């Protein structure tokens, strides 16, 4: 319950609409509460032999009350339910926005399906509480107070007897609600698994097809889906029990009214019209009794859902601007001079250091080549520069500033990374390349074309029917591996970063294309600090400085010629690759 108090700021934002909705509830229920009295008066007049014009008056009055009540019921929903949708939108925006700023460590411990379930199911549960829950709570309270006041004014004794079954109705709904909550939680957990599995299969559909595992994955999915169906059926069994019980208890109340009310009519203390009004009022009280238990159920579902959302939104990113950030540092202050001082790093939940005591200087405008076996820490090293991760020990400086003091947006805007795995969005090629542009109106087509030429992509794009307006599939699935890498390169250089990092981003292209791209990149790399990670020495041999990472440390450092002369790890790799080339040529 306490978690729902966090919704108060959202309610304050829409307090005028909510208050107006509550006022409309009073008008609607007030008119609705008079309707049974009109029916009762009409029946009494009929027993006395009323005139035709009197019946018309009662009919018109009844119709007028229904129209009046219905109009305000419409206005209620236009205010309170609309507010619930607006709050739902605000919650979804805040949740999604918060997710964008969480650090990498958060995503390493959460599945995409689980996050998606929070963004759909949990927010939907909260919305049901904010809209129907609050609306029906006030309606139930108002209707109960007004109806009981009128019933007690007609006959306190009959009212008390008629109300005896109704609390049982609320109790049943409450108990059913409790069972519903427990089973709903199980449904939610399976739904999260179902979403995760779906997302995983569709993301890896190429692997599934290449290994001919379609039937296997379908069977695995069917098992989860069947479990989801079973849990939903268990939930439906509990919910279906409540409706027959509601009908039984409502019928019991009506029978009590007819029996005891009939005796009162014979005694002369009540009229037939009064008894008729009683029956209608009991019908009106039935919904509040049901709603009471249903509202408790909504609260029971919304409270844990809100808590799950809060568990995420209360997480503070471990990499963010803080009181030590120097807001005076601007992008114009970043020139690209980088220094690692005694930097060591290990991933969260791990005891093993991926990098140990790294000391490295990269001068502004120079190119650093990095080579080493798989798992030596190459990608980890470059991910420390834009603070995707923070160094466990030691410090990194850019132009004399500790990177922890540089505002994150300044730091990351100054760094352009082409990652190992090229991720492209389901959008046009132009928008993928110009991703760093603020809005569509900020996109410069000439720059998009120029950067695509540098990345060796322009000829390929021109062969597409829609050219740069070609819409890519999910993750750029319509492009080849090499085309995706080149699109990522074009995207990085479109940003015009002071520091350009290529993380093995030419591995999917042939050596001739690689050479062409590198020659084009030289034109823009002259004035930029560049870091190139590669497995092929041909990619980095012209770098100003090259380091060899092995077992988490820098084993060798120097130019291509110096490292070949050294006769160490670099030289061995170079000789093996030369031999491979000779074998290919042979």
Give residue ranges: language-model regions.
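Transmembrane helix-loop-helix hairpins at lipid-water interfaces of multipass membrane proteins
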Residues: 18-72, 79, 153-157, 268-272
């Amino acid at each position: 319950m306490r978690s729902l108090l966090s919704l108060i700021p959202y309610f304050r934002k829409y307090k005028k609409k909510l208050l107006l909705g509550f006022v409309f509830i009073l008008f609607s229920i007030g008119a609705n509460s008079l309707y049974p009295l009109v029916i009762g008066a009409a029946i009494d007049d009929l027993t006395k032999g009323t005139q035709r014009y009197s019946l018309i008056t009662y009919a018109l009055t009844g119709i007028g009350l229904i129209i009046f009540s219905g109009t305000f019921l419409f206005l209620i929903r236009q205010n309170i339910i609309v507010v619930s949708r607006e709050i739902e939108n605000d919650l979804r925006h805040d949740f999604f926005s918060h997710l964008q700023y969480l650090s990498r460590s958060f995503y390493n411990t959460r599945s995409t399906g689980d996050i998606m379930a929070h963004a759909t199911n949990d927010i939907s549960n909260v919305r049901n509480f904010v809209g129907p829950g609050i609306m029906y709570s006030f309606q139930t309270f108002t209707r109960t107070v007004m109806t009981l006041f009128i019933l007690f004014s007609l006959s306190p004794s009959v009212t008390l007897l008629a109300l005896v079954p109704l609390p049982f109705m609320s109790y049943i709904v409450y108990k059913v609600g409790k069972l519903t909550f427990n089973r709903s939680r199980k449904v939610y957990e399976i739904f999260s698994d179902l979403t995760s599995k779906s997302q995983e299969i569709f993301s890896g559909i190429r692997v599934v097809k290449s290994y001919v595992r379609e039937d296997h994955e379908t069977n695995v999915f069917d098992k989860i889906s069947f479990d989801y169906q079973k849990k939903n059926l268990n939930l439906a069994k509990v919910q279906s029990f409540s409706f027959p019980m509601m009908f039984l208890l409502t019928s019991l109340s009506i029978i009590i009214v007819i029996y005891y009310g009939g005796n009162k009519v014979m005694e002369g203390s009540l009229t037939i019209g009064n008894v008729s009004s009683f029956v209608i009022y009991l019908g009106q009280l039935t919904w509040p009794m049901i709603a009471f238990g249903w509202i408790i159920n909504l609260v029971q579902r919304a409270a844990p859902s809100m808590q799950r959302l809060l568990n995420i939104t209360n997480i503070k990113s471990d990499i963010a601007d803080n009181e030590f950030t120097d807001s005076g540092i601007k992008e114009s202050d970043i020139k690209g001079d980088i220094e690692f001082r005694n930097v060591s790093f290990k991933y969260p939940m791990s005891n093993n250091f991926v990098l140990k005591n790294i000391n490295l200087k990269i001068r502004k405008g120079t190119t650093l080549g990095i080579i080493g076996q798989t798992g030596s820490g190459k990608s980890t090293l470059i991910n420390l520069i834009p603070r995707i991760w923070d160094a466990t020990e030691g410090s990194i400086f850019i132009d004399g500033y500790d990177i922890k003091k540089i505002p994150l947006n300044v730091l990351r805007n100054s760094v352009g990374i082409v990652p190992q795995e090229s991720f492209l969005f389901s959008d046009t090629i132009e928008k993928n390349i110009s991703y760093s542009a603020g809005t569509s109106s900020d996109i410069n087509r000439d720059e998009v074309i120029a950067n695509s030429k540098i990345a060796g992509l322009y000829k390929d794009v021109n062969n597409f029917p829609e050219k740069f307006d070609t819409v890519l599939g999910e993750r750029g699935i319509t492009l080849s591996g090499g085309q995706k890498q080149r699109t990522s390169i074009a995207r990085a250089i479109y940003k015009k970063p002071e520091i350009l990092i290529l993380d093995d981003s030419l591995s999917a292209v042939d050596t001739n294309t690689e050479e062409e791209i590198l020659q084009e990149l030289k034109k823009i790399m002259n004035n930029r600090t560049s870091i190139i990670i590669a497995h092929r020495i041909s990619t980095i041999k012209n770098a100003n400085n090259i380091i060899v990472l092995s077992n988490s440390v820098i084993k060798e450092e120097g130019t291509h010629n110096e490292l070949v002369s050294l006769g160490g790890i670099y030289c061995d790799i170079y000789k093996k690759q030369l031999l491979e080339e000779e074998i290919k040529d042979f």
